[in-house]
Regions:
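Radical SAM enzyme [4Fe-4S]-AdoMet core and its adjacent flexible, acidic
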Residues: 1-58, 62-72, 109-113
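Flexible mid-to-C-terminal extensions adjoining Fe-S/redox cofactors in radical SAM and related proteins
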Residues: 39, 57-128
Length: 128
């Protein structure tokens, strides 16, 4: 019902882009929950990172894989981001060993996913 409600509204300007992404996100979440699988590629650990208040770096806040602490690396993010720990995490994510409907990761993934961007573009340019 939420998807139908959002799609029933008519938005203008930048709000049309937001609405188009929101509908895609809701559809993505529905698929993830139904299929219990990573339905589009996840780029956590490549395109995004989480930095906890104490300086701990995670590739994804759901997995919370501790890659290291900025304080322990003289605040050198690059040393952590290209360190040894991230290699196994990236392999695991690429192998689709995890899935989640988290908005932070999902919106990043949708911005990199050509089919999603195509659907959003069509909805913005030629709304139904």
């Amino acid at each position: 019902r939420l998807i139908a409600y959002v799609e029933s509204k008519r938005y203008k300007g930048v709000a049309r882009i937001t609405e188009a992404f929101r509908v895609e996100y809701y559809k993505l979440v529905k698929r993830i929950l139904e299929e219990q699988d990573q339905v589009i590629d996840c780029y956590a650990g490549w395109a995004s990172a989480q930095i906890y208040a104490d300086g701990t770096v995670w590739p994804c806040c759901v997995r919370a894989d501790n890659l290291g602490n900025l304080r322990d690396h003289d605040y050198d993010f690059k040393a952590i981001w290209f360190g040894d720990k991230i290699k196994e995490v990236r392999r695991s994510i690429a192998a689709k060993e995890c899935y989640c409907p988290l908005a932070n990761a999902s919106y990043t993934n949708m911005l990199i996913d050509p089919p999603t961007l195509t659907r959003v573009g069509i909805k913005v340019i030629a709304p139904e």
